[in-house]
Amino acid sequence: MVSAGSTINLFGNFRCIVIQKIGELWGGEVTDSLLHKLIVAPPTEDRHGDVYTNAALVVGKFKRKNPMEIAEHLRQALAEVEGVDSVDVVPPGFVNLKCSNEVWYSAIRDINKAGKDYGAVNLGQGQKVNVEFVSANPTGPLHIGHARGAVFGDVLSNLLAWVGYDVTREYYVNDAGGQINTLVESVYLRYKEALGEQVTIGEGLYPGEYLKPIAKALVEKHGDKLLASEDRTAVIREFALKSILDLIREDMALLGVKHDVFTYEADLQRSRTVEKCVEFLQQKGMLYYGTLERPRGVEEEAAWQAREQLLFRSTDFGDDSDRALQKEDGSWTYFAGDIAYHFDKISRGFHDMILGLGFDHKGYVSRLKAAVHALSDGKATIDVKLHNMVNFLENGVPVKMSKRRGEFLTARDVVEEVGKDVARFIMMTRKNDVVLDFDFAKAKEQSKDSQIFYIQYAHARACSLMRNAPTLLPIEDVDFSRVSSAPEIALIKLLVRWPNIVESSAVNHEPHRIAFYLLEVAEAFHVLWGHGSRSVDMRFIVEGDIATTSARIYLVKVVALVISLGLSIFSIAPMEEMR
């Protein structure tokens, strides 16, 4: 009889068993295309059992056979697997398995033995992956939208590194565009103001108060010499860029975010990377001179003048329009610079790239994917993760800011208000492309309304039980059938899902799934704690019953382990005591 095997990765083991049974029943090796579509996972509803698979649907399509008939054959084969209590078939061909309690008892023992390696599946096998995130223009401190992207990129990088990828965290510094000229002009006005002149911050300049300390530092270093200096622009540019990048690095450090590589647009220009990239694409026949149609939304002829220009064949790769690489004055477009930057990434050996962008760049995704495909002959991939805006509230009331007056909440403001760990966790409590409501009052509450508090409280409770427990029986001697109540089994089933959560979060580049999961674990543990508060028989530490106490405390150890592993991916320290 085939066994479900170790419960360290229960769903991974069942996947292997399903693949084995498919091969035995229908012969031949299971193809990669079939494997890619095969799902073996926990069902969304308890009534569908403990494990479900779409194998019959996938094989039915592949073999052109009735999936219900295939499901019945698969049901009979899986019913023979040790640890499987029952197998059901549900139209149009899903197969649902229910495991025996012995599987859950074994899980407690196996997970305790695995310790901190529990869930660390080696998906990446050392493969290089480049995660570019934040990449905010160096014109001011990080606002809260940047902070959301920073936390997302950092947590995703942690997750990918934990599952075996060689991760490079990269920041692209746009230090060669028109916004830098605007920065220089804005700083110069503040410089004159620091020297005692009356100035007016004109429309289109940066009005923020954060420029005043930079201007003051310029005065301390140069006095009034820059007023008449021919090198004024270059001096201010270098000084302002360094000052603001230092400010950005400090803000990211407050959030617990650090990059491995900073790549500068100006350096790529100096090394003529754009020209090399254009030549490369021309040799591949990916560029041509042509005329674009009038963009949608531009109705008047006077607002649009058709002209022949250098275009990238973006539509060959699924984009809705070919894209211009050169402006009328002969300079390169922003998109040309972006193509060149990804040309540089690929030349550095990155064929697996992830890019975090603000949601307002949604229309940019298809052209960027087209460029990466063209540059690599389809060998490189880029996953663009869009992060949506953050709405700030105070007890449900929106916090009003004015961009016109240079008023906005910075990453520093938020960390100083609620702390790094709280800020990081809240940023992960919604899928990255969904608008996030951040309520300062709720964030600081010590209640279930503060999700990170709720999780930390569960961990602290678990640690308290472990500290106060008597010496436990050796784990090999423990009878885990003593943790057989419905809430205990429900908690174990949830804890067994951890490797599956890790894998799905990593494969889909969606680390918010871990936040959702940790909340489920915390809730299930608090429910079990509540049963113990109401019934002596359900307490974790049972006076005079070391056998039951040992079984329950080993379960508590798994709760603490899983919460600490999840929080470590978020770079949040688990709390052993609540103060």
Curated annotation (Swiss-Prot):
Locations listed in the record: Cytoplasm
UniProt-listed Pfam families: Arg_tRNA_synt_N, DALR_1, tRNA-synt_1d
Catalytic activity: tRNA(Arg) + L-arginine + ATP = L-arginyl-tRNA(Arg) + AMP + diphosphate
Major site of localization recorded for this protein: cytoplasm
Coiled-coil ranges (or none): none
Keyword Ligase: yes
EC numbers for this chain: 6.1.1.19
InterPro entries assigned: aa-tRNA-synth_I_CS, Arg-tRNA-ligase, Arg-tRNA-synth_N, Arg-tRNA-synth_N_sf, ArgRS_core, DALR_anticod-bd, Rossmann-like_a/b/a_fold, tRNAsynth_Ia_anticodon-bd
GO cellular component: a single term: cytoplasm
Membrane-spanning intervals of the chain: none
Keywords tagged on the record: Aminoacyl-tRNA synthetase, ATP-binding, Cytoplasm, Ligase, Nucleotide-binding, Protein biosynthesis
A single MF term (Gene Ontology): ATP binding
Residue interval(s) of motif 'HIGH' region: 136-146
One biological process term in Gene Ontology: arginyl-tRNA aminoacylation
HAMAP family: Arg_tRNA_synth (MF_00123)
Subunit relationships: Monomer.
Similarity-based family: Belongs to the class-I aminoacyl-tRNA synthetase family.
The name this protein goes by in its record: Arginine--tRNA ligase
Native source organism of the sequence: Anaplasma marginale (strain St. Maries)
Gene, per the UniProt record: argS
